Structure formats: structure tokens, C-alpha cells
Amino acid sequence: PPVPTRCIPHTRRGTILPAAEYDELANCENPELYAVFPYRLFGLFRPGIDTAHAAYEMRLFRKSGGWQQDAIQSALLGLGDEAARCVKENFLECHGGSRFPAFWGPNYDWIPDMDHGSVACVALQRMLVQYDGDALLLLPAWPKAWNADFRLHAPRNTVVEGRVENGKIVRLAVTPPERE
């Protein structure tokens, strides 16, 4: 079925709806943005990016901790500053009573909350590399001030390895070579 959308009269912008019909919302997620992640129906490679941006801007719950997906969804929409803020927030939050810094939480699943770290890791990867079918897009949501060495996997047994300095790729290797 088509993704439910509507036009917002005062802005004349379209937005994604959580469902074709619904009564009241009963948890702290933004189901309308599932069309961005995990289903990837909207994004940088797809039509309707403005509609997805509007849905992200108007989401009811603005959170990046636990299993909240703002970090991933903002990266997939190319919103680099927002993705960077969410990723930093997730990685910097740790539980002071735990021996290991990566024992995030307590969020929704208590301690350790591995959803919290996995969301940050997926978002960080999508900030560096995104893909759709055979197409690869590098640095779609990467802040220019961040430098990084990376080695990431993409579909079709592809590995993208490189270095980014001051917003520019200074070293890149894609294997197999025909995927470059």
C-alpha cells in the first residue's frame, strides 16, 4: 500500500502520517519515520525527500537515547548537524555506576542498553556511507569539521575504506574495484 501522507494547509508541505487511520498515540516513537528507517522508502536516493524532511521536523518525540532512531533517520535524510548532535549525545552518555563506559543506560531496557550504542553506530556509518541498489554515496551527512579513518561494509560484498579530513575524502579504496 502507499505510504499515508497529507498536505499541511498553512505550509503547503506534505508530510508522512503514522498510519492511514489512527486514534491516539500510545508510546514515545515516531512511526511515520519508519518509512525512512528501517524501511528506507524515503531518503537521499528516493523521491519525496521534502516530505520526509517535513515529517522529521514535525515529529512529536525528539530523542536520541535508547532505541530512539532520530540519529539514524537524520543521517539517512542528510541532516548532518542533527545526526552529529544525536551521535555525540548517544556516545557521551554513560552510566556512572557501571564499570564499562559502553554500558549505556538505563534507558528502556535497563543496563546495559545495547540499543543505545547500536543506534549510534548505525547512524555514524550512515553519516559516512549510504547506499541504494548499486549506488554508493560518501559523506552524505558528515560534518566538515570531523576527521575520520573508516572501513565500512556495503551491499554486494563491498568494502569502502578511506580517510576524510576537513570534509574531503583524501584516501579511498572500494573493493571490489568494479563497485568504485
Spans of features found by a protein language model:
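Catalytic cores of carbohydrate-active enzymes
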Residues: 1-53, 59-73, 77-85
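Non-catalytic C-terminal accessory modules of carbohydrate-active enzymes
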Residues: 81-180
